[in-house]
Amino acid sequence: MSNVIENLGKLDRKVTLAIPKAEVEKEKQERLVRLSKTVKMSGFRPGKVPMKMVEKQYGQQVEFEVRFDKAARKFFDITKEQDVKVAGQPKFEIKNEGVGEDEVAFDATFEVYPEVTIGDLSAAEVTRTGTEITDAEVDKTIDILRKQRVHYHARGEAGEHGDGGADVAAQNGDRVTLDFVGKIDGEEFAGGKAEDFPFVLGEGRMLPEFEQAALGLKVGESKTFPLAFPEDYHGKEVAGKTAEFTVTLKKIEWAHLPEVNDAFAKSLGIADGSVEKMRADIRENLEREVKRRTHSMLKDQVMEALLKASELEVPKALIEQDQERLVEMARRDLEQRGMPNAKDMPIPAEMFAQQAERRVKLGLILAEIVKANGLEAKADQIKAEIEDFAKSYEDPKEVMRWYYGDQQRLAEMEAYVLENNVVNFVCGKAKVTDKKVSFEELTAEGNQQQA
């Protein structure tokens, strides 16, 4: 039976589409006439190729296209008329049995969107983390900024930044420059030698044996020590062997951190050099980071709560579509990282199956909860979020123009606001426990979740 949508399962449907052959033939001839005006064929001027030759060359292909185009249009009309919400793309198969002589027919199989049932959210439990930015956190951030602007001066020098010392030994925090050479059984080996090699003592960037050898040395002094390479060392020629290294200290420099004054404040973009304003800006940035992290942590809990509270079947077609999107995202990421031939790299979609199913499921749940509770993002909400984001930039108005000048960026902010609305709605229903942590604890917890 044509035009009747059959139920094949929870989400699977089928409809038979019958199309009169006369309609197919009429549109086929119209397309061939249009094609004949542009088609090129040896021995004929453009637009002068006889219709019989055009039909012989292209008739079968054009008829195939017309049949499927008409089937697609009819499918769209039927599902729209019957208010059927199609998930993904239908699959068309030519139907041969039980078809009248004057018609062509297709079986279209497809999936529909599921009914989403969201359970009692009052049983959900979420933890809302809060953090207060103290003066100590501001001080720690200033120390980090100072260390990022560190410069070094040779020990034993006089002058404004000289330490006045003469015969000094290397200590933690100093930047040392040394030569080293390693030997195995008295012979040098590849990669075991360097000259004028700098590193900062105590940062842990060098092997512990090198750090210990350099500590306490004075310029011009040398020290020899053994270094055992592990069995699984990447250099096969030295793996499992013990080398004898000799280091010779050539320079010791001490770390000079900039003072916290107007010059330092200006280097951070404070035009008038106000240290007080600099501290206020740092506090504001830290509070913005706290808001971002705590919101992300709360959002993740809310999404998990919604997944647990909801019942729905997920259309396979939507999962497959999202798998392909994730494959393309992974490929673009590899390209941006400089991976050669990333465009042609085979990435199996199956590896994203679970992630895609979760994303699709959440998308369906969010769409339902937003629609049922009027949680759509309002224009004033979007504007307020953009204004808050723009505050951290030198020219907030330019940032506002940047957002409103691109529909994609605006859509991303709209999605963010919509998520906020859902989070606030769920928190209004669920059992929420407030938890206070330090900024350091918050950072550590956030990093663990990302790992």
Curated annotation (Swiss-Prot):
Annotated catalysed reactions: [protein]-peptidylproline (omega=180) = [protein]-peptidylproline (omega=0)
Domain of life: Bacteria
Localization of this protein: Cytoplasm
Domain named PPIase FKBP-type: residues: 173-258
Matches recorded under SUPFAM superfamilies: FKBP-like, Triger factor/SurA peptide-binding domain-like, Trigger factor ribosome-binding domain
Record GO biological process: 'de novo' cotranslational protein folding; cell division; chaperone-mediated protein folding; protein transport; protein unfolding
Keywords: Cell cycle, Cell division, Chaperone, Cytoplasm, Isomerase, Rotamase
Pfam family, one: FKBP_C
A single GO molecular function term of this UniProt record: protein folding chaperone
Listed GO CC annotations: cytoplasm
Enzyme Commission number(s): 5.2.1.8
Family annotation (PANTHER family): TRIGGER FACTOR CHAPERONE AND PEPTIDYL-PROLYL CIS/TRANS ISOMERASE (PTHR30560), TRIGGER FACTOR-LIKE PROTEIN TIG, CHLOROPLASTIC (PTHR30560:SF3)
Similarity field: Belongs to the FKBP-type PPIase family. Tig subfamily.
Domain notes: Consists of 3 domains; the N-terminus binds the ribosome, the middle domain has PPIase activity, while the C-terminus has intrinsic chaperone activity on its own.
Function according to Swiss-Prot or TrEMBL: Involved in protein export. Acts as a chaperone by maintaining the newly synthesized protein in an open conformation. Functions as a peptidyl-prolyl cis-trans isomerase.
Protein name (Swiss-Prot/TrEMBL): Trigger factor
Native species: Cupriavidus necator (strain ATCC 17699 / DSM 428 / KCTC 22496 / NCIMB 10442 / H16 / Stanier 337) (Ralstonia eutropha)
Lineage: Bacteria, Pseudomonadati, Pseudomonadota, Betaproteobacteria, Burkholderiales
Gene name for this UniProt entry: tig
